[in-house]
UniProtKB/Swiss-Prot annotation:
It comes from the Eukaryota. It is an enzyme of class 6 (ligase). GO terms for molecular function: ligase activity. It comes from Arabidopsis thaliana (Mouse-ear cress). The gene is AEE9. The lineage of its organism: Eukaryota, Viridiplantae, Streptophyta, Embryophyta, Tracheophyta. InterPro entries: AMP-bd_C (IPR025110), AMP-bd_C_sf (IPR045851), AMP-binding_CS (IPR020845), AMP-dep_synth/lig_dom (IPR000873), ANL_N_sf (IPR042099), EF_Hand_1_Ca_BS (IPR018247). This is Probable acyl-activating enzyme 9. Belongs to the ATP-dependent AMP-binding enzyme family. The keyword Lipid metabolism applies. Expressed in leaves, flowers and developing seeds.
Amino acid sequence: MELLLPHPSNSTPLTVLGFLDRAASVYGDCPSILHTTNTVHTWSETHNRCLRIASALTSSSLGINRGQVVSVVGPNVPSVYELQFAVPMSGAILNNINPRLDAHALSVLLRHSESKLVFVDPNSISVVLEAVSFMRQNEKPHLVLLDDDQEDGSLSPSAASDFLDTYQGVMERGDSRFKWIRPQTEWQPMILNYTSGTTSSPKGVVLSHRAIFMLTVSSLLDWHFPNRPVYLWTLPMFHANGWGYTWGTAAVGATNVCTRRVDAPTIYDLIDKHHVTHMCAAPMVLNMLTNYPSRKPLKNPVQVMTAGAPPPAAIISRAETLGFNVGHGYGLTETGGPVVSCAWKAEWDHLDPLERARLKSRQGVRTIGFAEVDVRDPRTGKSVEHDGVSVGEIVLKGGSVMLGYYKDPEGTAACMREDGWFYSGDVGVIHEDGYLEVKDRSKDVIICGGENISSAEVETVLYTNPVVKEAAVVAKPDKMWGETPCAFVSLKYDSNGNGLVTEREIREFCKTRLPKYMVPRKVIFQEELPKTSTGKIQKFLLRQMAKSLP
């Protein structure tokens, strides 16, 4: 058998881009995209449009070459969905950028990525133009205006001098007979994503065609995605490419419901109007939906995948009483999205709701296509006991792990170590049943008098208080103890403005549920906690505030 070697017929590079060809054949007349502006496309039309954009990108007028970076600054609109396919189909590397970044941060990313072309949403024109003004002339990318909400797709006189064309104009240059450019190897870079920067400066994460394929197929299998679901885009497409569901929805012929607005009234309205079956949502979005004053149980259940910050069991429990069936995953930008999920066991169905929610708040086990997950002592590299108590750093190994950080070999070597593991920087435990539970970011662990305190554990208790809307716990420097827990809290209010609670009452609430050393010494009330656009609470800002407190 040793003479049987790989052959071109059995070693075609893995890529998700072929999902679109198949969708056009199998689901051609089925709706692919719905938009709140009444835009409706079929999978045949989406296939045609993506090929035309890819063709135009490679034309002499735009001149994008294989391996060059093309950026997208926009919300969850149809054109942004199409670009997830069209850009890599042209042989270019797709770079989605958070549209809520300021001009300085945006210019840093554009310069670092050496982006040659940027597709810009109308709401981001001013910030992108300011960002480009900070760049040297030879660094400046061409700009194309996304025109999802415009009728004729023509450039206005005011935009004509800054933009090369509109999205519709670029499409009209393209050829739907274009043979899209397949990767030469499955290790070829496909995606450049920047980390959200909740703890430090963003890093450029490079993901291969193989990584995206492995992530997407595993996600579909793990979530038991059916054919032709209706998927609501509440998760930003710029956030790890919507955890791979940008391509996964094509594989199953889903209807993608796009929306600019992600607020409770809009989400409930779209769920009802379009009979939504699936959506992804950060814990912040679940919290928002469960606290909406006009909330009422859903007519039909909606499958929700949540990931990001560890979701408190109380939020999961409240969401499920409304008809949201919550699944829970864990991953990072560096893994392309969730690679661990809380695989449900039938015997858990008979437990009481709070116990089910507690189990579901754990991150779980590796997804089907991922290789290994462990918790190890970062100093020795040895596995910790699987007892639900012994804490270590979460380490990962599998096909969807990044190629590395762009232009950052030192940063890459620091997390992709010689022992063959990717070190996540997250702290967790593994329970006796083999299920992972994330306890904290390593930077979020509070060391009080030599004892390690999981901020997530304290936050979980705070979220069980009926008047607490949001909670985050950080370290506050202390001369005697080194660090003590400091809680930042926002509160719920009823129609009469009731819901006020004192710092003492919050601390007393915690004292009955936590060891004394874990009880917050300080509680700060805020109207709303600072968050990234993907819903993660910006603890580095809260840590700075805590340092200045008396």
